[in-house]
From Swiss-Prot:
GO terms for molecular function: structural constituent of ribosome. Pfam families: Ribosomal_L30. It comes from the Bacteria. GO terms for biological process: translation. It comes from Mycolicibacterium vanbaalenii (strain DSM 7251 / JCM 13017 / BCRC 16820 / KCTC 9966 / NRRL B-24157 / PYR-1). The gene is rpmD. This is Large ribosomal subunit protein uL30. Part of the 50S ribosomal subunit. Keywords: Ribonucleoprotein, Ribosomal protein. One of its GO terms (cellular component) is cytosolic large ribosomal subunit. Gene3D superfamilies: Ribosomal protein L30, ferredoxin-like fold domain (3.30.1390.20).
Length: 59
């Protein structure tokens, strides 16, 4: 299965609670921190919630 590299590029200051929790669920806490996750429906839903705070690349 394909994997996605997700990098946080913007701060969570001023973000809503659901957006902060989505980033924590993805494993992101700091700007420029990256994680690799499976490309599935759950991950895509979390990314959709915080698409303006992260960048996504296929690995």
């Amino acid at each position: 299965m394909a994997e996605l590299k997700i990098t946080q590029v913007r701060s969570t200051i001023g973000a809503r609670w659901k957006q902060r929790e989505s980033l924590r669920t993805l494993g992101l806490r700091k700007i420029r921190q990256s994680v690799v996750r499976e490309d599935n429906a759950q991950t895509r839903g979390l990314i959709k919630t915080v698409h303006h705070l992260v960048t996504v690349e296929e690995v």
